[in-house]
């Protein structure tokens, strides 16, 4: 995960995969903050990238909750 994840890539994930990705990103952010506090963080930009990834995940989850977009699982069920 050197670069951020695009919204298009996240929209292709199922709901449970999205929750897992959110959990991983939050853990990474925690570790980065810890490294920052101890002076071990080499790439400060990574903090910003991970925070934005988390925001993208929350946005996509909210879109699905409001019915603005359909999860890939729902699209497959409707087509079948």
Swiss-Prot record:
GO terms for biological process: translation. Disulfide bonds: none annotated. Gene3D superfamilies: 1.10.287.310. It comes from the Bacteria. One of its GO terms (cellular component) is cytosolic large ribosomal subunit. The gene is rpmC. NCBIfam families: L29. This is Large ribosomal subunit protein uL29. Keywords: Ribonucleoprotein, Ribosomal protein. The lineage of its organism: Bacteria, Bacillati, Actinomycetota, Actinomycetes, Pseudonocardiales. It comes from Saccharopolyspora erythraea (strain ATCC 11635 / DSM 40517 / JCM 4748 / NBRC 13426 / NCIMB 8594 / NRRL 2338). InterPro entries: Ribosomal_protein_uL29 (IPR050063), Ribosomal_uL29 (IPR001854), Ribosomal_uL29_CS (IPR018254), Ribosomal_uL29_sf (IPR036049). Belongs to the universal ribosomal protein uL29 family. GO terms for molecular function: structural constituent of ribosome. The keyword Ribonucleoprotein applies.
């Amino acid at each position: 995960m050197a670069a951020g994840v695009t919204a298009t890539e996240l929209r292709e994930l199922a709901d449970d995969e999205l929750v897992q990705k959110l959990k991983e990103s939050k853990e990474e952010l925690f570790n980065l903050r810890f490294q920052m506090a101890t002076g071990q963080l080499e790439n400060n930009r990574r903090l910003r990238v991970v925070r934005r990834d988390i925001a993208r995940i929350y946005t996509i989850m909210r879109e699905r909750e409001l019915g603005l977009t359909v999860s890939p699982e729902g699209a497959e069920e409707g087509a079948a």
